Regions:
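Extracellular beta-propeller repeat domains
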Residues: 1-316
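Short, composition-biased motifs enriched in small/polar/acidic residues
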Residues: 303-373
Length: 373
């Protein structure tokens, strides 16, 4: 049973199966399927243990010819592992065996930056989940942050994303309303911030009615300075939402709320549980249920066009626009008449905090600006 997302590297797909407990690869044309590694059987009593881990449900990470992943169970202490194996199936090694107090059942993949791996797990010293880091050789395991639950979130089931020295993620529960959070954390463990706490609503889990959504199970994606994600429940019909917010926690927006179901069917889907994919100006995602037959949907959401913002800073005119839509160029003209000629701005934008920025002196010739694609 393949559970986690696939990793694409060159013309090869890599993945894991949680029933059968394997790491596999195949070519993107479907040929050359190979089981790279099979995890050993567990033995009891609970928590069941083995030498290498069990139930890998993660998306793998790769560096050169080395794969990295997690198992949600098994290992020497029965609480899951971090492992590595070469892309040809040799060199398997358990990098870390979780003991519960330092993490339990890591279900998602790892983020690799240099020679450091970052991930999330349940458990931890406070029992509400943890963000951890370790070196790619297995040394230096560190709990960067342990969730407490009520204030900061609980159960970070989804994986992390990395931008610069900042990690972003979601917590399925906890927060002031117990409906989950979006958080940020520096890679050295400092600067934890709850970017958003999903608001309280009416009803009881999982049938909570709230405009924002509740219980974000999937991870985030980042485009420019905007984070996009899904909430598994909540919304106007308690069937989940798609949301966006800025990386500083401002500007939370519900992009879509999934409609009510009758016998688990509806027109757009219910319970989005996976991360989104952004291509151009369109988000794509899946739902666990709903749709015409109740078996889930694949959906898309067209994002609103990016806006050009103009501000005055001392003697300069500062123009900014998001970086999340490729191919946009800044153009200007000296008049808006029918004979207006728009020319591409000669000054290239500088990217600052996920925004394209162009600065012009106010003393320059009066011009009108627009974005063109």
């Amino acid at each position: 049973m393949p559970w986690g997302d696939l990793l694409v590297s060159s013309n090869t797909l890599y993945g894991t199966t949680c029933n059968g407990d394997t790491v596999y690869r195949l070519s993107t044309d479907g040929t050359g399927f190979t089981n790279l590694y099979s995890f050993t059987a567990e033995s009891g009593p609970y928590p069941y243990t083995n030498s290498d881990g069990a139930f890998p449900t993660c998306r793998l990470a790769v560096s050169a010819n080395t794969l990295f992943g997690t198992t949600s169970a098994g290992g020497a202490l029965g609480h899951g592992t971090v492992f590595t194996v070469n892309t040809d199936g040799i060199g398997f090694k358990t990098l870390h065996a979780f003991n519960g107090g330092d993490g339990d059942g890591p279900a998602e993949g790892l983020v690799l930056s240099g020679n450091i791996l970052y991930g999330t797990a349940a458990g931890g010293s406070l029992g509400c989940g943890t963000v951890f880091a370790l070196n790619t050789d297995g040394s230096g395991f560190t709990n960067l942050y342990n969730f407490a639950g009520p204030g900061d979130g609980a159960y970070p089931y989804a994986g992390l994303i990395l931008s610069g020295n900042k990690l972003y993620g979601t917590a399925y529960g906890g927060g002031s309303s117990s409906n989950g959070t979006v958080f940020a954390l520096n890679t050295d463990g400092t600067g934890f911030a709850t970017l958003h706490t999903f608001a309280a609503g009416s009803g009881s889990y999982p049938n909570i009615i709230t405009s924002e959504g509740t219980t974000p199970y999937g991870g985030l994606i980042l485009s420019g300075n905007t984070l996009y994600g899904t909430a598994q429940h909540g919304g106007n019909s308690s069937n989940g939402t798609v949301f966006a917010l800025n990386t500083d926690g401002t500007g939370f927006t519900t992009l879509h709320t999934f409609t009510a179901t009758t016998d688990w069917t509806n027109r757009d889907g219910a319970s989005p549980s996976a991360s989104l994919v952004l291509s151009g100006n369109t988000l794509y995602g899946t739902t666990y249920g709903g749709g015409n037959s109740g078996g889930g949907t694949v959906f898309s959401i067209a994002l609103p066009p990016p806006q050009l913002t103009v501000a005055v800073s001392q003697a300069n005119l500062v123009l900014t626009w998001p970086t999340n839509v490729p191919g946009l160029v800044l153009q200007s003209t000296t008049n808006l008449g029918s004979s207006a000629v728009w020319s591409t701005n000669s000054q290239l934008p500088v990217v600052i905090n996920g925004q394209n920025v162009v600065t012009n002196a106010i003393s320059d010739t009066q011009r009108f600006f627009r974005l063109s694609q």
